[in-house]
């Protein structure tokens, strides 16, 4: 498969002398993936003594793009946590900002989509050149246009970063997929289409079949997860020493990228199936998807490590998966997922500093 990205890379800005140049990757995962990621971010800050929002590059995909924008807008990890908990925020960019996590994106199920194929042109190209596209990109081309609205997400981002273009010097990068050409775009990079941050984040969150594609400068874009749930390989060539990857759709990785001790990815999935016995079509599909995401993530991180970048991975444990359930858009589980992630991520990061 050929990796295609519609822009050139840029080196990270120099950090303070003596400090490693760090990058942060926040993967997609819907409502519950965002809640898990907030818990993991808090654990990273506590364990490493490093403020994730201070990374030289913060790359977000889908729900991770929302959190990346919030961090780039100056929101602290403890404020993200308290906001998820429904506690009042009295200082900083989130002070007084209302966001209804229960209803913002329409609830646990999508509205009935429109009839028809979402991107006939992309589907035609993918059939002609299947090696050039991930399977999920090909599938997304067939999905009909969704009727869900991402405007509440856009309003949240505009409230934090304003309605204009990309802030000068911002570390924020947002991954999305061009819905006609099928290639990845990293908004915020030199050579990428110009976009307001809110537009870019909404584009990165536009799950085919759930939300309508988001138009930026006349072109339609969909969820960056249609290429990769993390897009961690996009951190190559940015002059970074180490990268933290938080991947809520992967399978229970430890900080250095292993599956849980002495177990490979396949063995971990078998144990998960034996213990939790996922039933129903959705549960089985999510299990298969997690396995595929984990394998792709490990391929991406091998590329980073081969280039000399230290990579630290975090993903849900068995305990997290049991709390999440199969529907990553179920708002009723959000609070429990956050608290579980705080516990399990702290344990996974014990002794990392």
Task: Report each predicted region and the residues it spans.
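Patatin-like phospholipase
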Residues: 1-61, 69-353
């Amino acid at each position: 498969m050929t990796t295609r990205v519609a822009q050139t890379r840029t080196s990270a800005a120099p950090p303070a002398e003596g400090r490693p140049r760090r990058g942060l990757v926040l993967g997609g995962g819907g409502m519950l993936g965002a809640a898990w990621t907030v818990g993991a971010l808090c654990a990273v800050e506590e364990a490493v003594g490093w403020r994730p929002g201070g990374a030289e590059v913060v790359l977000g995909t889908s729900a991770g793009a929302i959190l990346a924008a919030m961090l780039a807008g100056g929101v602290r990890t403890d404020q993200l946590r308290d906001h998820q908990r429904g506690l009042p925020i009295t200082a900083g960019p989130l002070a007084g900002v209302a966001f209804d996590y229960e209803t913002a994106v329409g609830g646990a199920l999508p509205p009935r989509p429109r009839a028809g194929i979402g991107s006939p042109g992309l589907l035609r190209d993918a059939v002609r050149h299947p090696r050039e596209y991930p399977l999920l990109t090909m599938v997304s081309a067939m999905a009909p246009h969704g009727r869900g609205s991402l405007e509440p997400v856009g309003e949240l981002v505009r409230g934090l970063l304003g309605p204009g273009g990309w802030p000068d010097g911002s570390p924020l990068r947002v991954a999305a997929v061009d819905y006609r050409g099928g290639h990845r775009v990293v908004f915020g990079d030199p050579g990428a289409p110009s976009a307001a941050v809110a537009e870019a984040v909404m584009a990165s969150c536009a799950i085919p079949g759930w939300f309508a594609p988001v138009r930026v400068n006349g072109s339609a874009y969909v969820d960056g997860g249609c290429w990769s749930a993390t897009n961690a390989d996009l951190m190559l060539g940015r002059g970074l020493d180490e990268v933290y990857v938080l991947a809520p759709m992967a399978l229970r990785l430890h900080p250095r990228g292993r599956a849980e001790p002495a177990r490979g990815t396949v063995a971990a999935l078998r144990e998960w199936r034996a213990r939790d016995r996922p039933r129903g079509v959705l549960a089985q599909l999510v299990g298969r998807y997690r396995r595929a995401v984990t394998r792709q993530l490990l391929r991406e991180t091998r590329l980073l490590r081969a280039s000399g970048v230290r990579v630290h991975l975090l993903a849900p444990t068995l305990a997290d998966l049991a709390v999440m359930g199969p529907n990553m858009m179920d708002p009723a589980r959000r609070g429990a997922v956050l608290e579980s992630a705080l516990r399990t991520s702290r344990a996974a990061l014990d002794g990392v500093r």
